[in-house]
């Protein structure tokens, strides 16, 4: 058997590859020589048919490697480079133009955005300052309103005291004038007046005239202004009225104003109480505590305004109403029936029928009692008109006092 020969050029290829000085084309040629030697050895040993299918593929691969290593011709490279340079030049010009547009556009937008931001910040600061001013003015307004309410209350109290003092002063002047007059010069009218005052129960030693008590109770007097004016027009007959017409009209005007204020305060109190009762978040214990506090405060205010000692609490006061609202239980729907009671319908149905019989049975007797008590009840007050509503309120409040 013939010894295997080394492929020519293989040691040189290794040395060139190690040295790194061979070109790509030379490497392809050395590779082709080595592969050809190996294929010839295979054909000599095993026959030409052993490498017949492999040779065309190896040759095609080596040709492609040669074309890739050598590259195209210089003329073809120049022809393909010219349009590429033109396209590159055009793209550079377009790039410069786009850069200029991009550089000019954002500057204007940034300037506009900067101005808008400054305006927005300034408006936000102004709005915050306005909100602070409005909040401060609102607090000042509330404080002024509270002061005004206190001043109005003090003014009304001072007016009431002034009217009482004027009444007492006039009464003292009249008593002093009567005391200075000689006893034999007393007129028959003065004697009759002294006799009537001495016989009237509840008068203080018969010295204070009747017009003094009437003037002190002017805010709660239920008389009509026309009747008061008629009484004013006859000062010589009674010898008791010492007020002028202007003073009496001023007193009536103050009384009407006070009644109007009391009516408005009652309406406002009823509204707040209605809101409080309809609020389901308020517990019942708090409502009871508020009930006791309102009742005590009402007694204190009443005793202070009337100048009487504070009354002790009684069982009737505790059971009495503490609000100005009417009973509106009929407005609320009945609670829904429990589903558990439906399983025991026989027992609950019997209880419901018995309760209905109990509620329906005393109705005739109750109606009869009302009919019997109706003739004994006093005659109802006449209806109040829009002009005399405050007078009617005073008339209804006088019997209670």
UniProtKB/Swiss-Prot annotation:
It is found in: Late endosome membrane; Lysosome membrane; Cytoplasmic vesicle, Phagosome membrane. Residues 240-316 form the RH2 domain. Changing residue 252 to A: Abolishes interaction with RAB7A and localization to late endosomal/lysosomal compartments. Residues 167-239, 304-388 are annotated as: Disordered. One of its GO terms (biological process) is endosome transport via multivesicular body sorting pathway. Residues 75-181 form a coiled coil. Residues 272-333 are annotated as: Necessary for interaction with RAB7A and RAB34, lysosomal distribution and morphology. The modification Phosphoserine is found at residues 314-315. One of its GO terms (molecular function) is protein dimerization activity. Changing residue 305 to A: Abolishes interaction with RAB7A and localization to late endosomal/lysosomal compartments. The modification Phosphothreonine is found at residue 308. Residues 310-319 have a biased composition (Acidic residues). Ubiquitous. Strongly expressed in fetal heart, heart, stomach, spleen, adrenal gland, thyroid gland, salivary gland, fetal liver, liver and lung. Poorly expressed in brain. Its main location: membrane. Changing residue 251 to A: Abolishes dimerization, interaction with RAB7A and localization to late endosomal/lysosomal compartments. Residues 11-101 form the RH1 domain. PANTHER family: RAB-INTERACTING LYSOSOMAL PROTEIN, ZINC FINGER PROTEIN DZIP1. This is Rab-interacting lysosomal protein. It comes from Homo sapiens. The lineage of its organism: Eukaryota, Metazoa, Chordata, Craniata, Vertebrata. The gene is RILP.
